[in-house]
């Protein structure tokens, strides 16, 4: 039974998703439908969490707008997600970066990861 579900989910999974890790700064192009109009909104921020796996995989992206922290959860394999770009690689030692919620300014900055680092 589990194999049947995996095969069914596999055909709906996207193949063009880049490798994303917590601490990375990403730009998510998200399709928004308002009435009969459709537009693409670009949301740029730091990945603070990556959850689940397979077709249910989600990322939580955080950004600060006019001094207020805004977080949004994106399902990676959703047809509404047009494209995801990795702007910057961050170097962190945690899988969940929820501690960034309490930090402000320079304390919330994440060091950039060099290409040869794991």
Swiss-Prot record:
The gene is rplS. It comes from the Bacteria. This is Large ribosomal subunit protein bL19. Belongs to the bacterial ribosomal protein bL19 family. It comes from Dictyoglomus thermophilum (strain ATCC 35947 / DSM 3960 / H-6-12). NCBIfam families: rplS_bact (TIGR01024). GO terms for molecular function: structural constituent of ribosome. The keyword Ribonucleoprotein applies. SUPFAM superfamilies: Translation proteins SH3-like domain (SSF50104). GO terms for biological process: translation. This protein is located at the 30S-50S ribosomal subunit interface and may play a role in the structure and function of the aminoacyl-tRNA binding site. One of its GO terms (cellular component) is cytosolic large ribosomal subunit. Keywords: Ribonucleoprotein, Ribosomal protein. Signal peptide: none annotated. PROSITE patterns: RIBOSOMAL_L19.
């Amino acid at each position: 039974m589990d194999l049947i579900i995996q095969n069914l989910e596999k055909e709906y999974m996207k193949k063009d998703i880049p490798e994303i890790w917590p601490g990375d700064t990403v730009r998510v192009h998200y399709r928004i439908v308002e009435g009969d109009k459709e537009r693409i909104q670009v949301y740029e921020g730091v990945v603070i969490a990556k959850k689940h796996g397979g077709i249910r995989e989600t990322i939580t992206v955080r950004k600060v707008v006019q001094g207020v922290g805004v977080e949004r959860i994106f399902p990676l394999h959703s047809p509404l997600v047009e494209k995801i770009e990795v702007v910057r690689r961050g170097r962190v030692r945690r899988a969940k970066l929820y501690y960034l919620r309490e930090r402000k300014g320079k304390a919330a900055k994440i060091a950039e990861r060099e290409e040869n680092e794991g």
